[in-house]
Amino acid sequence: MILKYPYATEKASMIVERDGQLQFIVDRKASKGQIKVAIEKMFDQPVTRVRTLMNNRGEKKAMVSFSNPKAAEEILSRLGIM
């Protein structure tokens, strides 16, 4: 499984409201293309950009931007986070 879980912190919530970006913890070996395809397939929303980083605990975090500005809030409400 490429997507492990959504990264839900106070800072991540501010980024959703400000930029419309979602953050996910993903498999360390997943590429940006694989992450994009997995998110588009799971949530039926077109992804415009995927940025990744490795945190100090060895987890890979993906920041995902959507073409629809309200897509991130819609996805979080479907997941029951927001």
Curated annotation (Swiss-Prot):
Keywords per UniProt: Ribonucleoprotein, Ribosomal protein, RNA-binding, rRNA-binding
Protein name per Swiss-Prot or TrEMBL: Large ribosomal subunit protein uL23
Chain's role: Binds to 23S rRNA. One of the proteins that surrounds the polypeptide exit tunnel on the outside of the ribosome.
Pfam family, one: Ribosomal_L23
SUPFAM superfamilies linked to this entry: Ribosomal proteins S24e, L23 and L15e
Cellular component aspect of the GO annotation: ribonucleoprotein complex; ribosome
Claim: RNA-binding is one of the keywords in the record: yes
GO BP, one annotated term: translation
Record InterPro entries: Nucleotide-bd_a/b_plait_sf, Ribosomal_uL23, Ribosomal_uL23-like, Ribosomal_uL23/eL15/eS24_sf
Subunit record text: Part of the 50S ribosomal subunit. Contacts protein L29.
GO MF term set: rRNA binding; structural constituent of ribosome
Family: Belongs to the universal ribosomal protein uL23 family.
